[in-house]
A protein has these predicted regions:
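Acidic, glycine-rich active-site loops and adjacent beta-strand->loop/helix elements
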Residues: 1, 23-28, 93-98, 140-142, ...
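Beta-strand segments within the central parallel beta-sheet cores of soluble alpha/beta enzyme folds
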Residues: 16-24, 86-94, 131-138, 163-171
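Short glycine/threonine-rich loop-to-helix capping motif typified by GTGT followed
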Residues: 101-112, 140-158, 177-184
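Condensing-enzyme catalytic core mediating Claisen C-C bond formation in acyl metabolism
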Residues: 46-128, 134-135
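Active-site-proximal alpha-helical scaffold in enzymes
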Residues: 1-24, 64-85, 176-188
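Conserved catalytic cysteine-centered active-site region
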Residues: 1-5, 38-64, 152-184
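Conserved small-residue
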Residues: 7, 35, 73, 91, ...
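Conserved beta-ketoacyl condensing-enzyme motif
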Residues: 18-32, 130-153
Length: 188
């Protein structure tokens, strides 16, 4: 997803009118071994794969590894109209967070204050109100920290119960593709 924001910034700055933005991920035992050692990969349902990744569920037992790539054509409105392109979405803005392991964060559970600040800044950068958000594509990985993610969203948006937007997790269907996850999920 960071590639989308980088492309957005270049187009908005007039340095490009159209860009191909996306990412890819690797796969293999050396990549996934560390995650397995941290006990965040699903292993309890190897005989029943449809139960393998269940974010926000009482039976959540880790995520399923995935790999792949995703890319989007991002362009200015003028460029899209000029070439009569089908417009699927509009990028309003966003925010990038880094340093999630500082101040109490870990590799598997980022610093909640930094995450909440990132969400708040993204909403402000998009010039929308939290109540305007219809759906959130969550990071949700079917680990014990899914609850923390929902709590961070709820606190950052100041929305609770029926006001809280729908939240989904495509990782439950395609696996966690690490660096490619955001791009693949945006394409989906």
């Amino acid at each position: 997803t960071e590639a989308i924001l980088m492309g957005f910034d270049r187009i908005q700055a007039g340095k490009a009118k159209r860009m191909l933005v996306g990412s890819c991920s690797d796969h293999g035992v050396y990549l996934w071994g560390g995650f397995d050692a941290m006990r965040v990969l699903s292993y309890k349902n190897n005989e029943n794969p449809e139960k393998g990744s269940r974010p926000m569920s009482a039976s959540a037992a880790g995520f399923v590894p995935g790999s792949g790539a995703g890319a989007l054509v991002l362009e200015s409105l003028e460029s899209a109209l000029e070439r009569k392109a089908t417009i699927y979405a509009e990028v309003l803005g966003g925010e990038v967070n880094s340093g999630g392991q500082r101040n109490g964060g870990t590799m598997t559970a980022p610093n909640s204050k930094a995450v909440q600040r990132c969400i708040t800044n993204a909403v402000e950068n998009c010039r929308i109100k939290a109540k305007d958000i219809d759906v959130i594509n969550g990071h949700l990985t079917a680990t014990s920290k899914d609850f923390t993610e929902i709590k961070n969203w709820s606190e950052a948006l100041q929305l609770k119960d029926a006001e809280f937007p729908y939240i989904n997790s495509l990782k439950s269907m395609i696996g966690h593709c690490l660096a490619a996850a955001g791009s693949i999920e945006c394409v989906a």
